[in-house]
Amino acid sequence: MNPVFNDDLKKLFGGMRYRSVSTYLKDKFGEKTIKLAIDGGFTCPNRDGTKGTGGCIFCSDSGSGEFASDIEDQIRLFSDKWPRAKYLAYFQNHTNTYAPVSELREKYYAVLANPKIEGLVIGTRPDCLSEEVLDLLSEISRTHFLWVELGLQTIHNETARLINRCYDLSVFDDAMRRLSVRGIKAVVHLILGLPGESREEMLDSVRYVSSLPELFGMKLHLLNIVKGSQMEFPYPDYQPFASIEEYVNLVVDCLEIIPPEVTIHRLTGDAPRSILINPPWSFNKRTILNSINDRLNLLDSWQGKRL
């Protein structure tokens, strides 16, 4: 147990009650650091028939990212407000290691040729990390900042089949081990509110991932039902949580069992209002985050308190 919110934790968390990735990056680079969403033009083995078709049931046609645009356009957008900001290029949509290594090399290094880009964030699947791909990522990590994001979503096999994930937990475990051997940082995505999962099952997924010694960061997504996903018609009225309060209480319980050194990359969903179906309150990201912070302060709680 960590019964005291001491000065070391306050410094680690940068004045917050959890270790946000924004705080981590500000400490590392000395300036605000912004991720720029990149669409690399990749597809997914869960869409092209290699593993499945249609993708995971929560994904829209454009994949998990909905905001990708040109790098320079994005930098111009941010530079007026943060003229000294640092930038990471985030290959977000679909599976960004699912291509011949020669193509990956060309696309990754083309982005890194921009002197304003400090490094890469690469979203992918655990079953799309061949030895050749890992060798390329290891090569890049020796000269540039890099982390890899893995979409696990749940540790429960029944839920994994329901969401059409198309790989076993053992594949994820092996990918984490092989990333660790090469010293490549790994961030794991989990979704809160998947159909059929109980509150305790969601917490079990958080506990499992939190126990991995090689874990760098975690994303906790609120399940968003969006237009263009396979959930749009079978689950149009599905509400993953009855209220924002129920969701906030669960997130606080999750944070309390995540080790303090793990970076927190997301605590809610982020679907644009134009495609969001449910839950209707989830488009107001700032309200959700403020409610989480208020709850942590009210309970005098913090990331890792229960460990």
Model-derived regions: residue spans:
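Structural recognition of alpha->loop->beta junctions
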Residues: 56, 112-117, 204-219, 288-303, ...
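Conserved C-terminal portion of the radical SAM core fold
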Residues: 170-229, 245-268
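Short, electropositive alpha-helical surface patch
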Residues: 105-109, 138, 198-216, 244-245, ...
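Core AdoMet radical
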Residues: 62-74, 78, 82-101, 116-129, ...
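Acidic (Asp/Glu)-rich catalytic clusters
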Residues: 78-82, 107-115, 135-145, 177-181, ...
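N-terminal [4Fe-4S]-dependent radical SAM core
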Residues: 1-88
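Hydrophobic faces of well-ordered beta-strands that scaffold small-molecule active sites
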Residues: 34-38, 87-92, 120-122, 146-150, ...
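Auxiliary Fe-S-binding modules of radical SAM enzymes
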Residues: 1-23, 32, 224-307
